[in-house]
């Protein structure tokens, strides 16, 4: 009698584990379908190359005259890389901060100022880069994305996030923000050894 109860409890636990595993598989399949559909739509819309797999997808091509490469994986999230002309050879690191719950509906300037930590080898470069309000406004919504990092090293501008974004409008928002940032970086040039 006791052995029968132990067997039934064990079978019940096994059945629950199997149901949980099946639910996870169905959820992963739905996410993968949405991912392929969203990324494929963006690639098709802008004439880019889309490569899909079960656990990773990538988009390669040109966007507003810049070479881009976007890679997404289930485990690591997403990385987007874009070429730019970094005439001043500066470095840049933008990290999204954890926003306090008291900051409910901030304006773009407040969101940008409190939502990001900015680092560079040159404070003058940072000041000149973010002098334009339109660039700060374009980047400000990205501060709401936990773990987001944007870096500039050499001629490569890179965005990474631990979350996988699957919708084409989300990817387009990243592309537009990165393109505006690249344009701002390119506008800072050396003239006779001095920045203008």
What residue ranges belong to the model's regions?
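Charged, low-complexity intrinsically disordered regions
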Residues: 10, 36-77, 81, 85-196
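Transmembrane-cytosolic junction motif
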Residues: 17-45
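Feature marks short, highly hydrophobic, charge-poor N-terminal signal-anchor/signal peptide-like helices
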Residues: 1-12
């Amino acid at each position: 009698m006791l052995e029968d109860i132990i067997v039934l409890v064990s079978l019940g636990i096994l059945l629950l584990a199997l149901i949980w595993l099946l639910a996870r598989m169905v959820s992963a399949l739905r996410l993968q379908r949405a991912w392929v559909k969203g990324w494929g739509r963006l690639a098709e819309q802008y004439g880019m190359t889309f490569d899909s797999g079960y656990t990773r997808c990538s988009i390669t091509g040109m966007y507003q005259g810049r070479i881009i490469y976007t890679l997404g994986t289930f485990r690591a999230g997403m990385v987007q890389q874009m070429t730019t002309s970094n005439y001043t050879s500066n470095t840049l690191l933008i990290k999204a901060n954890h926003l306090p719950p008291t900051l409910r509906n901030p304006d773009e300037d407040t969101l940008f100022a409190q939502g990001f930590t900015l680092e560079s080898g040159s404070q003058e470069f940072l000041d000149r880069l973010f002098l334009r309000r339109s660039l700060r406004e374009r980047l400000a919504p990205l501060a709401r994305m936990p773990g987001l990092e944007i870096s500039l090293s050499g001629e490569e501008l890179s965005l990474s996030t631990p979350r996988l974004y699957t919708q084409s409008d989300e990817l387009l928002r990243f592309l537009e923000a990165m393109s505006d940032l690249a344009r701002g970086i390119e506008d800072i040039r050396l003239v006779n050894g001095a920045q203008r």
